[in-house]
Amino acid sequence: MNLSQDGIKLHRGNFTAIGRQIQPYLEEGKCFRMVLKPWREKRSLSQNALSHMWYSEISEYLISRGKTFATPAWVKDALKHTYLGYETKDLVDVVTGDITTIQSLRHTSDLDTGEMYVFLCKVEAWAMNIGCHLTIPQSCEFQLLRDKQEA
């Protein structure tokens, strides 16, 4: 059985089949940690596209106000630094075997749709606070989730 790093979507229809796939691991006598949490889909392509549109809009806004360094890539990193933070990784030097622990910005691709919605809300609030009004297409997933929240 090849378990995805993202986990398995468990539901009534596949419970028995998953149990059969896990059983051989248990017969080896090893113990495992199982975390059960509600399933949420990974952040969507619509959310990703909106975030990149916003990085460009914020970049244009900042550059027009003299912040010439504020490229879309810089904006993306700055917002991830502020609102997502960092993850720790151990990297192994393949020649020496030395392990170096580094910190790298979290990736939006690791967020679920709810976490990405929260990130986008924080970005939008910050942008509004500096006077930058971001475009929100009426039919985009962000707007649909917002409408659902406010219903």
From Swiss-Prot:
SUPFAM superfamilies membership: NinB (SSF103370)
Domain of life: Bacteria
Alphabetized GO MF terms: bubble DNA binding; single-stranded DNA binding
Miscellaneous notes: Encoded by the cryptic lambdoid prophage DLP12.
Protein family per UniProt: To equivalent protein in phage 82.
Protein's UniProt name: Uncharacterized protein YbcN
Organism field: Escherichia coli (strain K12)
